[in-house]
Amino acid sequence: MTDADRFEAFVREYQDMVFATAVRLLANPTEAEDIAQTVFLRAFERFSSIGTSATAAGWLKTVTTNLCLNHLARYRARWQFFSELDRPGDERYETTVAAASNDAAEAASRQEALEQAVAALPDHQRVPLVLFHFEDMSYKEIAAALGISLAKVKTDIHRGREVLKRAMTGVV
């Protein structure tokens, strides 16, 4: 197997994780694709050291998170959070539901509603919430990564949760 083949297999193994992390943080699939490409360019440059490492997934998540945070800081004023979410026919955002299962359909409906509610949060609430719940970062780690106080992290996560609770009230 050539180096190119090994890197192609590496990308296939981790591309969904990298893309999902970027989409959760950016709430914009197009920007997430750009970040994912940059992540894999950096991975290619360091492939000899990370390609077979047991910590490759962690390295990729860290690089993805940092690139997303940098992107948010640079382009915050120009962001449009809802511009490309929920595109009909885009398989990455459609939940496959077994037609015979009402429970699965209800779960899919709740999942979609939650994803929309998270995407609708202002970035100062969404980013810490995603880092805490999806990336398993501590409050202190989030504060350090975002360059904000620990109290602000706690407040933003709390307020984000409250908005999500209100948005999810009555969702099947």
Predicted regions span which residues?
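DNA-recognition helix of helix-turn-helix
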Residues: 65, 69, 113, 117, ...
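C-terminal edge and immediately downstream basic/flexible tail or linker adjoining helix-turn-helix-like DNA-binding
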Residues: 1, 5-7, 80-86, 140, ...
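A short pre-motif secondary-structure segment
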Residues: 128-132
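Sigma70-family region 2
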Residues: 40-55, 74-76, 167
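Arg/Lys-rich amphipathic alpha helix in sigma70-family domain 2
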Residues: 51, 65-83, 93, 99, ...
